Amino acid sequence: MKTIDSIPTSKIQRASKLIQTGAKVGVNYIKYYGDKITKTEEEAKENLNINNASDIYDGLKQMKGSALKVAQMLSMDKSILPRAYVEKFSLAQFSVPPLSPPLVNKTFKNYFGKQPNEIFDTFNATSINAASIGQVHQASKDGKNLAVKIQYPGVAESISSDLAMVKPIAIKMFNIKGKDSDKYFKEVEDKLIEETNYINEVKQSMEMAEACQNIPNLVFPKYYPDWSSEKIITMD
């Protein structure tokens, strides 16, 4: 899978990406009105949904973060979206272009002052899984096999601004109504704030493991605070 060398992180950059995606959707609607002349309404609408789903997903997967997370969560409720959107947006759960190795190395340098191969005995710079807010790499240290989760740049900082931009678009395109939309997007925002707080995740996970250590047959991952930071989590 093709990797990404940069992610739009500023509000202007991310808004520009949404505008570019919106322009493609506008072209798709022009095609749709042309298709209605030569095709049935059902065929024309299906083509519109397929084209829009593809263009919107392509734009969101480059932005990553909360914009892509909204698409992922919408795809879980098949009553909201047409089938073409469900099929495309569900890819956000497991099939997103990962950060390139140089960008991974830069993230480590920013938070540890070292490259990953200076911290671990081995580190696979190619991720084994990439989703909406981060990706996972395999590593090893002192004979232990480790999973290293890296959060995408700018994700936590752009949650509120992303949702403010995406919300009116989603409401209009997918007919999400009134108070339900406010509740839905508040839940998305709260979930994203929680998921991007890596320091708190490590702390809570270690506390839970300690509290449950005497329960038979219950195994928790071991977290390594020395190899974790605001944007990186290392666990076994």
Where is each model-derived feature located?
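Short, conserved clusters of charged catalytic residues that mark active-site
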Residues: N51, D55, K203, L218
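Switch/connector loops and helix/strand junctions flanking conserved nucleotide-binding motifs
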Residues: A156-S158, T234
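Flexible glycine-/small-residue-rich
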Residues: Q93, K141, I150-Y152, P225, ...
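Residue-level signature of catalytic and energy-coupling elements of molecular machines
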Residues: A71, V136, V148, E201, ...
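Conserved protein-kinase N-lobe ATP-binding Lys motif
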Residues: Q93, I150-A156, V188-E194
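Conserved structural core of kinase catalytic domains
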Residues: L163, K167, K183-Q213, V219-D236
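N-terminal accessory/targeting segments that precede structured cores
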Residues: M1-Q135, D142, L146, S158-F185
